Structures are given as structure tokens and as C-alpha cells.
Amino acid sequence: FEITNFSNNLCYSGKVLSTKSQGAFGELWSSIKTVNVNGKRERENQINLVEAEAIVDTVVKCCQNPLYRNMSMGVISLLGDEQGEVIKDLLEKKLGQDKIRERNILCGTPYTFQGEERDVIFLSMVISNNIKFATLTKDSDVRRFNIACSRAKKQMWLFHSVELEDMSKDCIRYKLLDYCKNFKIINKKGNIKIA
């Protein structure tokens, strides 16, 4: 429920639309994880290499962890195609094609994942403070983030290089990071203010 609650509130006025299984792995398991990597977005493209490397290292560790046995995985860039391509290339070098096929690992943008789900999804926010970034408030932004945040069946990781105070509260990125960092508190209160 924790994973889908953000999307449900964002797009469906809080009505629960999915009953994806969560918390099936005991106390060590959290259905939502955030990782601040303090990376920097490159000036000439939409790549945050530190974030990409952190995601790849985490995917590799998850593939080696018995808790993730037989789980499919996906990586979604929340800013353009380039980050997903870099992550895909790094995964091919670190894991190899056989392990990528075995885990059904897919890398791309939210639209790459339309109609697709994976047990574990890793989101890359990409943006950082070294380059100005837009406040995302359009319906198309909301749809993109809704797709990204509703692809995980068991666990979602959000990798970021900015903090809440770096963004406008109106930005969908702010709302996602706030939810992921505070989902246990928000769910106990029973609601999250999206708009």
C-alpha cells in the first residue's frame, strides 16, 4: 500500500487502486527507500553519474542479497533518456547480459515502463543544485511521475541529489521526495496533501 499511496493520492483522490504486496519480508524490509548521493548533474546533458553509479551498485547488491531472490528489477530516470542509458551500460558491465535477462532488468523513462511492472523499481531523480532545474507542475509531469511511482510491486528506491529545501513545494519532485522520506508518518495520518 505504501508504494501505491503516493500515486493514488496524486491522481485518484486517495482511492486505493492496487493491492500490491508490501512488507512481506519482515522487519528488515521497507517498501520505500530513499538514498541521497549528493551527486551533480553534468552541464552538457541530463546525466548524474554519481547517482547512476549508486543505483548500479545497489542493484548489484540486491541481486546478491537472498531477500531479493528471483525478483525482477527496473530503473527509471525521472529526467530524460540519457541517465537510463548510462545506467543500462553500467549494469551490462557490472552484471552482464545473463543476469540482466534473468532479473528482467529494464532501464528507461516512465514511458518505457507503461504496461510494465517490476518487483523492485529504482528511481533516479537526476537533478542537482549545480544546475538550475524547473519546477514541475504540469499535468504531463504528474502523469509521468504517476507512471514511475506505480511500477513497483514490492519495493521502490528513490535516489536523489537534492533535498526538500532545494525545491518548490509545488513541484512534483518535492511531493515525491517528501512522501518517500515521510511515508510512514503520512500513512499514519491517513492522507498526503498533493495539491
Can you name each region flagged by the protein language model?
Residues N8, S21, K94, N130-A195:
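Helicase C-terminal subdomain and adjacent C-terminal extension
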Residues G14-D89:
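Conserved helicase/translocase motor-coupling segment
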Residues W29-I32, E117-V120, A152-M156:
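Short glycine-/polar-rich loops that comprise or flank the Walker A/P-loop
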Residues I76, F122-S124, C149, W157:
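Structural motif
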Residues L91, Q97-L123, S128-I131:
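Conserved motor-coupling elements within RecA-like helicase/translocase cores
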Residues F1, G80-Q83, T112-Q114, I127-N130, ...:
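Conserved nucleotide-binding/hydrolysis micro-motifs of P-loop NTPases
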Residues F1-Q22, L78, V162-E165:
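Conserved coupling/interface region of RecA-like P-loop/ASCE motor cores
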Residues I3, I55, V75, G115, ...:
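Hydrophobic, well-ordered secondary-structure elements that form the walls
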